[in-house]
Structures are given as structure tokens and as C-alpha cells.
């Protein structure tokens, strides 16, 4: 193991064979907000050889309290491009595909067929593209993990990793379950969710944001 190997600690933990698998993997991360940006960075630091990141949003002042790409110097800039520069600075050898696009039902199949993905991280916060991504990934037998809702919640001790069908106290999980059932999806889906009940005082009803009926404290 070379002294200048920046992945030395990870290799000590996981072993050489697992590191080879990680370096040979192509991971798709969709949604680069409060969850996806951090997940993508950890994958980058873990040594994933190839990654595709997808998000059409630009950095807004309301992102400053929690989102990785949000700084005064990056306001108004595309999140995907800001993060791509950061990830390449961390791991110059990573093969990075940057897609600053908004996923819709009709362009998800094209995305999933554009490359051979080994794993998908779903960090989308709107129902339709989230469910359609899950549906299309399962059709193609691509492994996927999905992030559920954390808005209006603050107790990190209640974060859980479970099957979608076993979640509770999570409005997004409930909505995703209903939509997937209508789409005929009955397979297990690993998700990250919180058992904490949302604080109603931290929810602001609004119709101003695209595909969102409320804004939650985060």
C-alpha cells in the first residue's frame, strides 16, 4: 500500500477486493440537495470510479443552512456544476458525467439506458419522477436506495434504514407506496426514513414551488 495513496484508510477497512469493486462501479445519483450532494461526495471519497450526477436546480439563499454546494460565492450557479468541480478536486481520477437537467417521466428511461449503472441513489423530493425512477430501475434490475422525507423533523436518532413497506410516520413514504402500488410495484425497496412525526408548526403551505404543496423547516 503506497504512502501517498489517499484511499489507504478505506482500503484498510474494506480490503483490496472490495476497493476494486468500488473503483469499477458506476453510480447514478439523482437529486443534489440536502441528501444527494452528501451521498455523492461520500461515494466520491470512497473511490467510486464512475458517477453520474443529475439535478437541474441552481443554488438559492434558502439552501445556505444545509446544502453542500450553497455558499455566497455560488448563489445562482447550477448545483450539479458546483458539485462536479468539488468532486473532481477530491478525486481527480473519477469519471464524472454531469446532467443539469430536470428529470421527468418521459426522459427517465433514456437516462437509465444511457449507461450501465451498478447502483442508483434516489434523492428526489417530488413524487412523480421519484416513483418513475424507482419503477424504471426495478424494471431493469438496477439496485436502488431511496431517500424519504426529513422536512419538519430534527431528531437524528430516529433515522432508520428499512424496506419502504415497513416505514411509518413519513408522509413521503406513504405517498410513494401508494403510487408504486398503482404502478404494480410490490418488490422490496431499501429506503432511509425517519420515525419522527413531522412538527406541524414547521410546515408552511404554499403553491409557489414547482410540484410542491408545502415548504418544511429543514
Ranges and model annotations:
Residues 2, 113-119, 124-129, 139, ...:
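Glycine-rich phosphate/adenylate-binding loop
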Residues 48, 53-91:
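Glycine-rich phosphate-binding loop and adjoining beta1-alpha1-beta2 segment
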Residues 1-27:
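N-terminal charged helix/coil linker that caps or initiates catalytic domains
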Residues 35:
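Hydrophobic/small residue at the entry helix of a nucleotide-binding pocket
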Residues 100-108:
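Conserved SAM/SAH-binding loop
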Residues 73, 95-101:
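Conserved SAM-binding strand-loop segment of SAM-dependent methyltransferases
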Residues 29-31, 54:
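Conserved N-terminal Rossmann-fold NAD(P)-binding element of oxidoreductases
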Amino acid at each position: 500500500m503506497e504512502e501517498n495513496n489517499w484511499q489507504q484508510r478505506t482500503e484498510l477497512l474494506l480490503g483490496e477486493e472490495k476497493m476494486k469493486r468500488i473503483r469499477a462501479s458506476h453510480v447514478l445519483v439523482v437529486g443534489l440537495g440536502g441528501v444527494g450532494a452528501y451521498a455523492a461526495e461520500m461515494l466520491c471519497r470512497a473511490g467510486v470510479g464512475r458517477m453520474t450526477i443529475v439535478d437541474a436546480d441552481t443554488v438559492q439563499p434558502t439552501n445556505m443552512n444545509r446544502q453542500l454546494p450553497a455558499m455566497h460565492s455560488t448563489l445562482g450557479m447550477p448545483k450539479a456544476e458546483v458539485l462536479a468541480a468539488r468532486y473532481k478536486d477530491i478525486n481527480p481520477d473519477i469519471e464524472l458525467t454531469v446532467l443539469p437537467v430536470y428529470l421527468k417521466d418521459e426522459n427517465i428511461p433514456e437516462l437509465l439506458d444511457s449507461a450501465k449503472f451498478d447502483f442508483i441513489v434516489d434523492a428526489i423530493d417530488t413524487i412523480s419522477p421519484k416513483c418513475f425512477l424507482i419503477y424504471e430501475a426495478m424494471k431493469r434490475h438496477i439496485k436502488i436506495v431511496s431517500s424519504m422525507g426529513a422536512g419538519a423533523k430534527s431528531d437524528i436518532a430516529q433515522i432508520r434504514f428499512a424496506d419502504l413497506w415497513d416505514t411509518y410516520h413519513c408522509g413521503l413514504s406513504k405517498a410513494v407506496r401508494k403510487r408504486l402500488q398503482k404502478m404494480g410495484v410490490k418488490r422490496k425497496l431499501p429506503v432511509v426514513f425517519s420515525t419522527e412525526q413531522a412538527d406541524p408548526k414547521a410546515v408552511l403551505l404554499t403553491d409557489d414551488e414547482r410540484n410542491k404543496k408545502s415548504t418544511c423547516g429543514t
